[in-house]
Amino acid sequence: NRALSLESIFSSPINFETFRSYGMQVNNFYPWLTLYPLFLLIKFTNLAIGYNLFLYIVTLITLFICHYVMYEITKKHVTSSFFAIIYTTSSFRSVEIFLRGAMGELLAMSILPLILLGFIKLYDSKKESWVMLAISMTLLIYTHVLSVAMTMVMIIIALIIQFYRKKKIEIFLIIKLIKAAIVTLLLSLAFIGPMIEQTLYQDLNRPYVDILQKRAIYLGKEFLIGSIDSELLSFGIGLTLLICLIILTFNFKKLGILSKITYIMGIISILLCTKIFP
């Protein structure tokens, strides 16, 4: 229905074609730009063919993006291929495809590796190295707003780790981040502007408010079983990543700077999903 609701998106964000024509206003608050190709595929084929074709195309794009990003970082095709396969076939993507049908989160996962590369490129000596971060963050804003918030948290954590490691504020990095933020904001105004305007104007009444803290996992037996179990509804990082985590833990001192920072951020990400974090 999210895709079908884009039938009249260029004339009005409110759609009367779905959900018994009650007038769905979700497009004011939920990005739709990267979802529009799904609507076109459904329009020119049918719902089943268009939906499955879209999933196939997104999966291929995710594979190519992951390989490109990791190759830019490591310059190793084997490492890049392993990363692309593990990331694209991860349990979370499988849940989004086969259980939840959450297209926004699925598309966001295709963009996140580009943001990683964009952040790493900030340390490049080239003056315009911030452009990739600005473009990829803009794409994410037009795809999934919650992912933007989580990405910003991870960027802040990475900056804190870097500050702790170097004991100084890197002015050149701050300048590039400011440039990327300004350009991202300007490019995203087409969505952010109407969303803020409607948020301030409309009283949003939610029939049910979920308490996410209740869904947090216990860092112990539940986490280990969820990681080893192949059940998509279980909570964990998966057997492959669990093995990688154990290996990296015992070989932490041998890792390079980038690998150490990535490892630390991975541990922090896991802790944020547990009962430890309020």
Predicted features along the sequence, with ranges:
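Membrane-embedded transmembrane-helix bundle of lipid-linked glycan/lipid transferases
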Residues: 1-278
